[in-house]
């Protein structure tokens, strides 16, 4: 299994604010673009991927929306609006949740009130963690053993204190090249490298 975590530090956890933030300063469209490129292939979807979207602009708890492609039946279409609507639905379902609670949104989709740090701690048990860094090991030279998990951010970089936590959990830095890319572009390159080496 491949896992991808997108930490969206400016994405609101209120569904209406989330939808209103498309194309605005919070750039919530990044979540839909990344989800699209992580899950879908031509005329189908990957069945070996789990995607976690962590939305952190909140008055109570972060929301982590999980898309497990092994169990997803119908996501509503291969376009930005369908994916944004699915995320907004998850946010609506999460209203009133207490800390570290989980609810089912649809088949293969859940929403939880867990933080990025807690999520990554949990994933570190079963996954080899990787974070993007221009100075990291080239993805073409990196050996992948077992289940890789790739940690990405929206347009707001990962805070320094998070890097220290991730290092303690064994996260390794990998590079996709000399340019800073959008998360939605990173996932395409990562999938391509892993597909070639399978």
Swiss-Prot record:
EC number: 2.1.1.-
Species of the source: Shewanella baltica (strain OS155 / ATCC BAA-1091)
GO molecular function annotation: S-adenosylmethionine-dependent methyltransferase activity; tRNA methyltransferase activity
InterPro entries: Alpha/beta_knot_MTases, TrmY, tRNA_m1G_MTases_N
Record GO cellular component, one term: cytoplasm
The family this protein is said to belong to: Belongs to the methyltransferase superfamily. TrmY family.
Biological-process GO terms, alphabetical: tRNA methylation
Entry protein name: Putative pseudouridine methyltransferase
Enzyme class: transferase
SUPFAM superfamilies: alpha/beta knot (SSF75217)
Recorded superkingdom: Bacteria
Location(s) in or outside the cell: Cytoplasm
Residues that hold S-adenosyl-L-methionine according to the record: 132, 186
Pfam families: Methyltrn_RNA_2
Keywords per UniProt: Cytoplasm, Methyltransferase, S-adenosyl-L-methionine, Transferase
